[in-house]
Curated annotation (Swiss-Prot):
Family: Belongs to the ATG5 family.
UniProt name for this protein: Autophagy-related protein 5
Taxonomic source organism: Caenorhabditis elegans
Topology of this chain in the membrane: Peripheral membrane protein
Biological classification of the source: Eukaryota, Metazoa, Ecdysozoa, Nematoda, Chromadorea
Cellular compartments annotated: Preautophagosomal structure membrane
Length: 275
């Protein structure tokens, strides 16, 4: 693991605008709420601060978290996917770089799932365990102390905003040694308007050569018959993670150790290249 690379990834934030659209109120909607959110965080952790701002309006009407839903460009958002992934999926231009999120108080669509803070913590810790099972058959998480798990979650909640505390714990989850390498790499691939995809992917080919992230993504897509992405296109898709165009030849093990989100998965967004 590279300390400086991981720290830069950790410090990355994205600009977000939350706009309330409700059916009630006599004084109109409150002004949009603007904020910078960590890429590694989740909408489930941000929404209470957003609603607190909206609930200060003069007419006294309150918006409750269990009676609202979120959308971007008409698509319901997933509160349990890292904010950085949502931002990268939006594929915003440099001139329109703010992620605009609509907070609606109408009946939520079936595909929207409300996730509160406690649910998000449980989902995050489950992802950590799944990632460790893929890598080490859960050897690390089985031996983690309870306060270490709690410290990892506090770091995601930015309590406190201390990268070094996170670094201490995540190093244990990323340790490898000669003859004790990761069995598989936790990788999730996102294609527009589809659920994320993952498969059992090794860091090396059978001949011992390093698998690249481009090869790994192709393997994940080929294992999914539902994908509409043409991996044989004349123009290879862009691989985006943390807002970075990841070169296809990047070793997968490097990405796993330096570009994974705090849940220990590499989250890669595929963007098709239009000639």
């Amino acid at each position: 693991m590279d300390y400086e690379v991981c720290r830069k990834v950790w410090e990355s934030h994205v600009p977000c605008q939350f706009t309330l659209q409700s059916s009630g109120g006599t004084h109109g909607e409150p002004l949009p709420f603007y904020t910078m959110l960590p890429r590694f965080s989740y909408l489930a952790l941000a929404i209470q601060k957003v609603l607190s701002s909206f609930n200060r309006r003069d007419d006294g009407e309150k918006v409750h978290s269990d009676k609202m839903w979120l959308e971007h460009n008409g698509i319901p958002l997933k509160m349990y996917i890292p904010i950085g992934v949502i931002y990268d999926q939006a594929n915003l231009s440099e001139n329109d770089s703010i992620l605009e999120i609509i907070v609606r108080t109408s009946q939520p669509p079936p595909q929207f799932q409300m996730v509160d803070r406690d649910m998000m913590e449980a989902m995050f810790m489950q992802n950590i365990k799944e990632a460790d099972y893929l890598k080490t058959k859960a050897e690390i998480t089985k031996n983690m102390m309870k306060d270490e798990s709690a410290q990892l979650w506090r770091s995601v909640c930015n309590i406190p905003d201390n990268f070094d505390e996170f670094w201490t714990i995540v190093q244990k989850l990323m340790e490898t040694s000669e003859g004790n390498e990761f069995a598989h790499i936790p990788l999730r691939v996102y294609v527009k308007n589809q659920a994320f995809k993952q498969a059992l992917i090794t860091a090396k080919h059978p001949d011992g050569s390093l698998r690249t992230i481009g090869e790994a993504v192709s393997d994940v897509l080929s294992s999914s018959s539902s994908s509409s992405t043409d991996s044989q296109s004349e123009h290879p898709p862009r691989l985006i993670s943390h807002g970075i165009d990841i070169p296809h030849h990047t070793p997968l093990i490097f990405a796993a150790k330096n570009l994974s989100y705090p849940d220990n998965f590499i989250h890669v967004v595929l963007l098709l290249v239009v000639p």
